UniProtKB/Swiss-Prot annotation:
Keywords, sorted A to Z: Cytoplasm, Methyltransferase, Mitochondrion, Nucleus, S-adenosyl-L-methionine, Transferase, tRNA processing
EC number of the protein: 2.1.1.228
The organism of origin for this protein: Neurospora crassa (strain ATCC 24698 / 74-OR23-1A / CBS 708.71 / DSM 1257 / FGSC 987)
GO MF annotations in UniProt: tRNA (guanine(37)-N1)-methyltransferase activity; tRNA methyltransferase activity
PROSITE patterns: SAM_MT_TRM5_TYW2
Compartments, record wording: Mitochondrion matrix; Nucleus; Cytoplasm
Keyword Nucleus: yes
Phylogenetic lineage: Eukaryota, Fungi, Dikarya, Ascomycota, Pezizomycotina
Keyword Aminoacyl-tRNA synthetase found: no
Protein name: tRNA (guanine(37)-N(1))-methyltransferase
Gene field: trm5
Length: 475
């Protein structure tokens, strides 16, 4: 081996650092209480003590370039000198790669050797102390769980404000408390960890769930911000899913200021409140009285009471009631007045009049986010505008409402889910539909929203209510 080859090998160039030394100790404490003190470790390294602090940045760059500097996630290579007296004088060290050994100059690379030769550096042993705070959730849990559980370490959870909501698989249940404690320690802004309690697949009518608190206080009163609106609610009493923010935004972006939107299953208002904020009139219904209560809270918090009306009834009856009530509001001349921007003080222009926006006579969009069953409500559109063909005459320029109905279907790359969804819409609407352009009567646009299970996805189907359905006689 030539001298340069020896030097190369010694300096760690071309060699991967042995990073296993930074793994936490294996603490197979079982399902018992989490003992954070067991997660301490001393890693023996070498460090380049820098004689003059003004040279730190120069040597940091050089040693980084020659791959002699320690590169390890969440560890700064610049540390205080291990000698307390020198540290008190402000002396610093640069931590070196584990391949570099202080007593073995043949492991030092050219940059290090040169620094030592110039008496600007000295290479010293350094005992790096690592503890529980250093390691990630994954590191700690891997260290605790037995190896047969390493293949699918629980990592995902929903959050609602300070609450992390887990849905642990059966085989991780014995470790639920330890897992929750570590999540609590390692996730900023999480104060409570809960686990969904299996209720043998049965979902509650209001899409709430049974849970047990695994770590932190049993405090389910949460605050969240979504689409620039703030919500405060009891997460145990109403439905909330932070993973739907993009879907909420997608539909909100379709609504125009001054239009009317009827949200049939509005929850606490993640469609309604931001839509109201952009000047859309919203009739926001939910059958859960708790949702209705917290929607009112959100309306007040976000100052959208001029635009958003909370209603609490069965969505099936709401559909006709909403069409009638919007028309009534229009006939009564209900409107909002939008205060103009104050004129600049320099101009002595007369104060501009507020802008009046009337509630239009008809609904532009219905939203139905209750994916498990909403399609079954579609029969309720029959007769929604019975006797009101005039409202949608060619001269009026008005179109029948678009319905956006959420649903579940298969996960497949072909047309299977589209055809499945269209078949079910056909059945419940009582009118044949096929995949296509929602502006064409009898055609449906299907948007793929998100994965919900290995073989199941959530979709949103959008279509205009067919004339035959809208103008049918009410029974
Ligand atoms: C999946 S959540 C969606 C809530 C909200 N739209 C969202 O995106 O977060 C479905 C909502 O439907 C409400 N709900 C269930 N059955 C209903 C019915 N028959 N009529 C009206 N609302 C209903 C539940 O209370 C729940 O808030």
């Amino acid at each position: 081996m030539s001298q340069s080859e020896k030097e190369n090998q010694g300096s760690g160039e071309g060699k991967t650092q042995d990073m296993a030394i930074f793994s936490p100790p294996v603490v197979r404490s079982g399902a018992g209480a989490l003992n954070r003190a067991l997660f301490t470790k001393t890693v023996n390294l070498a460090a380049a003590a820098v004689n003059d602090n003004r040279l730190i940045s120069k040597y940091r760059k050089e040693l980084e370039h020659s791959k002699e500097l320690l590169r390890q996630d969440r560890l700064s290579p610049i540390v205080n000198h291990p000698d307390k007296a020198l540290a008190d004088q402000g002396k610093k060290c640069l931590l070196l790669s584990p391949n570099v050994k202080a007593p073995e100059p043949e492991t030092w690379g050219a940059a290090l050797k040169e620094g030592v030769q110039k008496k600007e550096l000295s290479v010293i042993p350094y005992e790096l102390q690592l503890n529980y705070d250093y390691w990630t959730y994954h590191d700690i849990i891997t260290s605790i769980l037995p190896e047969e559980l390493h293949d699918d370490i629980p990592s995902g959870f929903n959050t609602a404000g300070h609450v992390a909501h887990m849905n642990l698989r059966e085989r991780y249940i014995p470790y639920k408390k330890v897992i929750a404690e570590v999540i609590l320690d390692k996730t900023t802004n999480i104060r409570t960890v809960i686990n969904k309690v299996d209720n043998v697949g049965a979902e509650s009518e209001f899409r709430t769930f049974q849970y047990e608190v695994l770590a932190g206080p049993d405090d389910m009163q949460v605050q969240v911000t979504e689409n620039a609106c703030s919500f405060e609610f009891d997460y145990s009493k109403v439905y909330w899913n932070s993973k739907l923010e993009a879907e909420h935004r997608r539909l909100i972006n379709m609504f125009e200021p001054g239009e009317v939107v009827c949200d049939v299953m509005a929850g606490i208002g993640p469609f309604a409140v931001p839509a109201g904020k952009k000047g859309v009139f919203v009739w926001a219904n939910d059958m859960n009285p708790e949702s209705n209560k917290y929607m009112q809270v959100a309306i007040n918090r976000n100052k959208v009471s001029q635009y958003v009306r909370p209603i609490c009834e069965d969505g099936r009856t709401f559909i006709h009631h909403a069409a009638d009530s919007v028309l009534e509001a229009h006939k009564n001349g209900e409107h909002v007045l939008i205060a103009p921007k104050p004129p600049s003080r320099a101009k002595k222009a007369p104060k501009p009049e507020p802008k009046r926006v009337d509630i239009p006579p008809t609904i532009s969009h219905f939203v139905m986010n209750l994916p498990a069953t909403a399609i079954e409500f579609l029969g309720c559109y029959r007769g929604v505008y019975a006797g009101h063909e005039d409202l949608f005459s060619a001269e009026s320029g008005r179109k029948l409402p678009l319905v956006h109905v959420h649903c579940f279907s298969f996960k497949a790359d072909d047309e299977t889910p589209l055809n499945d969804i269209c078949e079910r819409i056909t059945k419940y609407l009582g009118f044949p539909v096929k995949p296509g352009n929602p502006d064409v009567e009898g055609e449906v646009a299907v948007h793929d929203v998100r994965d919900v299970a290995p073989a199941k996805r959530m979709f949103c189907a959008s279509f205009r209510i067919p004339r035959e359905v809208a103008f049918a006689e009410r029974v």
